[in-house]
């Protein structure tokens, strides 16, 4: 059960980082 929780936290962290980078890079993409 603990493994499932740690996996969920890991995936959640990766998703947060992905969206943070995505929204940060969006203005540059739009300017192109």
Swiss-Prot record:
GO biological process: photosynthesis
UniProt keyword annotations, A-Z: Chloroplast, Membrane, Photosynthesis, Photosystem II, Plastid, Thylakoid, Transmembrane, Transmembrane helix
Pfam family, any one: PsbT
UniProt subunit comment: PSII is composed of 1 copy each of membrane proteins PsbA, PsbB, PsbC, PsbD, PsbE, PsbF, PsbH, PsbI, PsbJ, PsbK, PsbL, PsbM, PsbT, PsbX, PsbY, PsbZ, Psb30/Ycf12, at least 3 peripheral proteins of the oxygen-evolving complex and a large number of cofactors. It forms dimeric complexes.
HAMAP family: PSII_PsbT
Function (record text): Found at the monomer-monomer interface of the photosystem II (PS II) dimer, plays a role in assembly and dimerization of PSII. PSII is a light-driven water plastoquinone oxidoreductase, using light energy to abstract electrons from H(2)O, generating a proton gradient subsequently used for ATP formation.
Similarity section: Belongs to the PsbT family.
Protein name in UniProt: Photosystem II reaction center protein T
Organism field: Phaeodactylum tricornutum (strain CCAP 1055/1)
Gene assigned in the entry: psbT
């Amino acid at each position: 059960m603990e493994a499932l929780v740690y996996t969920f936290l890991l995936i959640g962290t990766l998703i947060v980082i992905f969206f943070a980078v995505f929204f940060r890079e969006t203005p540059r993409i739009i300017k192109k």
